[in-house]
Amino acid sequence: MQLSSVQRGADMKKVLNKQPNSAHCFVCGLENDKGLKASFYETEDGEVVALFTPHPMHQSYPGRVHGGISACILDETMGRAVQIGNPDIWGVTVDLSLTYKKPLPYGVQLKAVGRITRNLRLLFDAEGEIYTPDGEVAVTAKARYVKMTIDQITDEYDPSSWKVHLHIDDPTEV
């Protein structure tokens, strides 16, 4: 498999695990025609990396990804970091702030990275960034999350719609 420019570079990290996708989530839902269909990978250094390809329907200004899309992908990527080693715990967003540094194009694969910076019993703080195809930081984010089980979040959870979908072209490094 040939790696895209977003996946190449000295900062490549070994993938330890692929995280599940849902059916209908806007960010990771594989059956959501308008969604990002992002794939999430846990790395050897305790980060979560999302690979996703935004499309014209995700634009704001012509040729540019809408800032809300950046917020969505970073929120989910950072929030998933708590599931490393704790797949039954979910991060529910309390506070999220972003800094936009460069525009993001659509139609190419992009990479978001998230990590926990402070981990308490009921809360955690995280930070993350999205990279341009040439490896520059385009968006940075910081957030705070409450730790919850899925039963505390919703009574409409369907475990059959939340599973890992392995593909032959899944990367071994991101």
For every predicted segment, state its role.
Residues 23, 27-65:
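Catalytic strand-loop segment that frames the active site of acyl-thioester-processing enzymes
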Residues 3-17, 105-106, 117-174:
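HotDog/MaoC-like acyl-thioester-processing domains
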Residues 3, 77-111:
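Hydrophobic beta-strand-centered segment that forms part of the acyl-chain substrate-binding groove
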Residues 68-72:
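Conserved N-terminal beta-strand and adjoining loop/helix that marks the start
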Residues 50, 96-100, 114, 128, ...:
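A structural signal for short, well-ordered beta-strand segments
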Residues 14-26:
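N-proximal, solvent-exposed amphipathic alpha-helical segments enriched in charged/polar residues
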Residues 21-22, 34-36, 46-48, 90-96, ...:
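A generic structural signal for short beta-strands and their flanking turns/coil linkers
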Residues 41-43, 115-119:
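Short beta-strand micro-motifs enriched in acidic
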